[in-house]
């Protein structure tokens, strides 16, 4: 029967689709199938066909069914043909939206650390006392400067006093000589007959009076150390008057000189023009003294030492 099975075509085994899960009842196995799987020959005594099939060795793992069904009748089977129930995978779970927890409220900001306390103010170091030799040196410089300034002021006061006295004397001598020149010479002429001589006489009078006033004021200053007229513009007044009187003296003396020269050229040398020339010469000396007084008053105005 084995030889007859080899000559016939090998039918493919089919499963019972009725849901029994076993092979057909009319299929029989040979006695030697349990001993050696390699020599297994399946014989079918079914009335439709008898065929034998060689079953190769298979692994013990599950093998997919060659014709699985969709209606639940199929399943899994092992190498020996035993059918096993197929376990369908569980239905996928409906994807739920991920639960998001609300964000935690922000923590309150920590207060800034208090500023560091300011460093304690260290007491200022006491000023170092200057060395004694420096004090002595500064005193040596200051005291002589003060003394020299005082000496210079005293010298200028004495010089101004002498200049005022000289200006007063010169102006007095000039006006006295010219005033005495009356009814002189062969013509018995007088200075009052000529404008140039009258002009010179008037300037000498004013110069004399001003010089006497300045002499008294300087004497009072040197004796009591106080000004006769304590006015802030006193220095400017002295400087202006000295300049004006010096200019008047030089102009009056020049005009009187021209007139005396004209008389000498026209009428010859005589006592009248000679006395006029003497007064004019003294007026020039008074002009020089007033120029010196103007320099002293300018020094006092800009240096304020007196």
Curated annotation (Swiss-Prot):
This is CASP-like protein 4A1. Residues 100-133 have a biased composition (Pro residues). One of its GO terms (cellular component) is plasma membrane. Belongs to the Casparian strip membrane proteins (CASP) family. Signal peptide: none annotated. It is found in: Cell membrane. Residues 1-158, 223-242, 299-306 are cytoplasmic.
């Amino acid at each position: 029967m084995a030889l007859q099975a080899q000559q016939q075509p090998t039918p493919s085994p089919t499963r019972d689709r009725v849901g029994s899960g076993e092979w057909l009842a009319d299929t029989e196995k040979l006695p030697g199938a349990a001993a050696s799987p390699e020599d297994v020959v399946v014989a079918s005594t079914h009335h439709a066909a008898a065929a034998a099939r060689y079953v190769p060795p298979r692994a013990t793992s599950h093998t997919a069914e060659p014709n699985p069904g969709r209606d639940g009748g199929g399943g899994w089977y092992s190498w020996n043909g035993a059918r096993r129930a197929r376990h369908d995978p569980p239905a996928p779970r409906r994807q739920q939206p991920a639960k998001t927890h609300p964000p935690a409220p922000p923590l309150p900001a920590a207060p800034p650390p208090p500023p560091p306390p300011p460093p304690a103010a260290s007491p200022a170091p006491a000023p170092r006392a200057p060395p004694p030799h420096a004090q002595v040196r500064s005193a040596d410089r200051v005291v002589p400067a003060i003394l020299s300034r005082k000496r210079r002021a005293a010298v200028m006061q004495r010089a101004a006093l002498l200049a005022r006295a000289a200006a007063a004397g010169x102006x007095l001598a000039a006006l006295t000589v010219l005033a005495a020149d009356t009814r002189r010479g062969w013509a018995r002429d007088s200075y009052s007959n000529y404008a140039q001589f009258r002009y010179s006489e008037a300037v000498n009078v004013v110069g004399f009076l001003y010089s006497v006033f300045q002499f008294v004021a300087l004497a009072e200053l040197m004796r009591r150390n106080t000004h006769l007229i304590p006015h802030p513009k006193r220095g400017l007044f002295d400087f202006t008057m000295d300049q004006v009187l010096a200019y008047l003296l030089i102009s009056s003396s020049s005009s009187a000189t021209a007139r005396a020269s004209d008389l000498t050229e026209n009428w010859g040398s005589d006592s009248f023009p000679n006395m006029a020339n003497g007064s004019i010469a003294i007026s020039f000396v008074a002009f020089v003294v007033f120029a010196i007084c103007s320099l002293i008053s300018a020094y006092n105005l800009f240096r304020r030492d007196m």
